[in-house]
């Protein structure tokens, strides 16, 4: 019976990904952004559960999943649009923006490493966790290049984003950060795409700064992690 589901076609993996994503998006909006209903998180859990319950292999899913994965990198390029829209702000505060994001990203990388060695994780797990500061399209090839497990990296990136999506705006308000540039950079640096979504709810400037942060963090991760990995591992 399972064979009749078309599991050997790309449509299977695409539908297994998109159906829970669309449903979760509907309820996520209905519940005013309840973090456990974050579409990325729900579709990931639902996909794993479906494959586990049906006994369908990951290889069957991957046929269609790879097609979705192909569009991750072109989608990331879209973050250049807010960069262009806010180019005057970027020119005016470029040192503060680049400096703040660079410091935040390096601290995040070191904290990830300290947590990993505290819990005595193996080198492969540490390599999988180090790139999680970047968005998925950037983190996965970096993880693969330093000997990490891409699936584990993807999980780390998504969980990190879900937490920031749920708590990021509240933390910004808790610390009374009123500057829209600072708020956007904080959310984008810590939560990548979902951080930008949280920043969007605060304002247009926050959204643009969050998008800028995603791009810059990605560049830093690509440049720094491959250099740090041989030293730390």
Curated annotation (Swiss-Prot):
Keywords: Cell membrane, Cytolysis, Membrane, Transmembrane, Transmembrane helix. InterPro entries: Antiholin-like_LrgB, CidB/LrgB. It is found in: Cell membrane. GO terms for biological process: cytolysis; killing of cells of another organism; programmed cell death. Its main location: membrane. GO terms for cellular component: plasma membrane. The chain crosses the membrane at residues 5-25, 33-53, 63-83, 97-117, 152-172, 212-232. It is a multi-pass membrane protein. It comes from the Bacteria. Belongs to the CidB/LrgB family. LrgB subfamily. Inhibits the expression or activity of extracellular murein hydrolases by interacting, possibly with LrgA, with the holin-like proteins CidA and/or CidB. The LrgAB and CidAB proteins may affect the proton motive force of the membrane. May be involved in programmed cell death (PCD), possibly triggering PCD in response to antibiotics and environmental stresses. This is Antiholin-like protein LrgB.
């Amino acid at each position: 019976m399972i064979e009749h589901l078309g599991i050997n076609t790309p449509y299977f993996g695409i539908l297994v990904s998109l159906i829970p994503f669309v449903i979760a998006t509907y309820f996520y909006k209905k519940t005013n952004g309840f973090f456990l209903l974050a579409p990325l998180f729900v579709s990931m859990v639902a996909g794993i559960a479906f494959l586990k319950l049906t006994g369908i292999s990951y290889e069957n899913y991957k046929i269609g999943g790879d097609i979705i994965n192909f569009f991750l990198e072109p989608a990331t390029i879209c973050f250049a649009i807010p960069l262009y829209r806010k180019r005057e702000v970027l020119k005016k505060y470029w040192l503060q923006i680049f400096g703040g994001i660079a410091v935040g990203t390096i601290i995040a990388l070191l904290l990830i490493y300290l947590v990993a060695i505290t819990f005595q994780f193996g080198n492969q797990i540490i390599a999988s966790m180090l790139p999680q500061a970047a968005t998925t399209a950037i983190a996965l090839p970096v993880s693969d290049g330093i000997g990490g497990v891409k699936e584990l990296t993807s999980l780390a990136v998504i969980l990190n984003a879900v937490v920031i999506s749920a708590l990021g705006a509240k933390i910004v308000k808790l610390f009374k950060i009123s500057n829209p540039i600072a708020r956007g950079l904080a959310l984008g640096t810590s939560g990548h795409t979902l951080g930008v979504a949280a920043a969007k709810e605060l304002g247009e400037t926050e959204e643009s700064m969050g998008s800028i942060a995603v791009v810059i963090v990605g560049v830093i991760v690509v440049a720094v992690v491959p250099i740090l990995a041989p030293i730390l591992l």
